[in-house]
Amino acid sequence: MSPVDQNELSVPSLVDVLHAAIRDRILKGDIEPGASVTEMSIATQYSVARPTAKAAMERLVVDGLLRRSTNKTARVPLLDTEDVRDLYFSRELIERSVVERLAMKRLVPDEAEKYVTALRDAADEPTVTAAVSVDLGFHRSLVTALNSPRLIRLYDGLMGEAHLCMAQAYGILQTERVADEYSRILEAIEAGDVQAAGDEMSGHLDRACLRLVSHMRAN
């Protein structure tokens, strides 16, 4: 077998492009929560074959951005307060452990520091792309810093719903306040204070969950 040209590996497939396009529309709210998404509608809108549409939709199901039961039409999830509580419960179990491990090593990821700066900058442009994506990028940078492929896969399985949840209520994201909380997490990691790092992360996620639940109840 001849060697594979590395450039070929970086070229996105049609499924990749389609997946990204639909994902962006869902997160921006162009495809509203509760809306149905069918292979036929996607194939027609994007002028692609139905197998291509199906493959893209299957990825979105894995991402948590579509839900589909057996023989049922796929729909954009409409998350309720119990979904949010369970999501943040799961995230806290993972992320508290992550920052405690990082604190043991006094390992502050460079990428995480960049996200804190980017989040402060996003205060002037509070959009889904500028704020929510940066916010979640910070969290993921901590997870990836431990270099565990299985942990990353586990975490990524939650991130689609987390992104959707925040995108549906992104107006409540207090970027300056959240950036300050992130700075305290990184300071605790740098100091090697395992307890403080864990407590700061738990407190951050608990407050975020409470804000989201309160927002959902009010609306």
Regions found by a protein language model. Give the residues of each.
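Short linear motifs at protein or domain termini
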Residues: 1-107, 209-219
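Alpha-helix boundary recognition
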Residues: 27, 61, 156-159, 190
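Short beta-strand-centered segments that line the small-molecule binding cleft or hinge
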Residues: 174
